[in-house]
Curated annotation (Swiss-Prot):
Small GTPase Ran-type domain: residues covered: 10-174
Protein name: GTP-binding nuclear protein Ran-1
Organism per entry: Oryza sativa subsp. indica (Rice)
Record CDD domains: Ran
GO annotations of cellular component type: cytoplasm; nucleus
Subunit structure: Found in a nuclear export complex with RanGTP, exportin and pre-miRNA.
Length: 221
């Protein structure tokens, strides 16, 4: 979904909207993809930066036009123009901030009000940071709404490709689609404790086997 002033491409392209509280790392995440950062365009009428992120799959090249809010969400909700024609989405929160997770349902509601039945990935960012406040087992919203969830670290590139691969498979209707080439990413700014993160992922898997809690606040006080 290209903007009027953007060049169209002769391979599949999709509008991907990225939402979440300010400071959760949405811009940092998108900017890891170097060609997308180099070719980004600013759309002044809506106040967004659009990053064209290309990925190479076994079925050919695809492009996500990633819409980044440029921080407007700090001043209230986003305008409908940001969401209109969105074909897929990422909702991001910060695992070091309980409030950003508490606000995920609001972002999900706003998104679904305009974009019905699109594939959505929930991402818990900043898993490289030691003082994690939202534990893996406390993340249950995706199970209630049938979303995919990934733990990511924008600054270390950990799991960078997973949300895009999931969305590409959903949009193509092909569960066997896979990336055949790694996109050029910015060098990691931090290193992640892989042993600790594997423990978090194990907790996540164990929690998925448990019944959902009855409360709506997902255990976050």
């Amino acid at each position: 979904m290209a903007l009027p002033n953007q060049q169209t491409v002769d391979y599949p392209s999709f509008k991907l909207v990225i939402v979440g509280d300010g400071g959760t790392g949405k811009t940092t995440f998108v900017k890891r993809h170097l060609t997308g950062e180099f070719e980004k365009k600013y759309e002044p009428t809506i106040g967004v930066e659009v990053h064209p992120l290309d990925f190479f799959t076994n079925c050919g090249k695809i492009r996500f036009y990633c819409w980044d809010t440029a921080g407007q969400e700090k001043f209230g909700g986003l305008r409908d123009g940001y969401y209109i024609h969105g074909q897929c989405a990422i909702i991001m929160f910060d695992v070091t901030s309980r409030l950003t997770y508490k606000n995920v349902p609001t972002w999900h509601r706003d998104l679904c009000r305009v974009c019905e039945n699109i594939p959505i990935v929930l991402c818990g960012n900043k898993v490289d940071v030691k003082n994690r406040q939202v534990k893996a087992k406390q993340v249950t919203f995706h199970r209630k709404k049938n979303l995919q969830y990934y733990e990511v670290s924008a600054k270390s590139n950990y799991n960078f490709e997973k949300p895009f691969l999931y969305l590409a498979r959903k949009l193509a209707g092909d569960g066997n689609l896979h990336f055949v080439e790694t996109p050029a990413l910015a060098p990691p700014d931090v290193t992640i404790d892989l042993a600790a993160q594997q423990q978090h992922e194990a907790e996540l898997a164990a929690a998925a086997a448990q019944p959902l809690p009855d409360d709506d606040d997902d255990l976050i006080e």
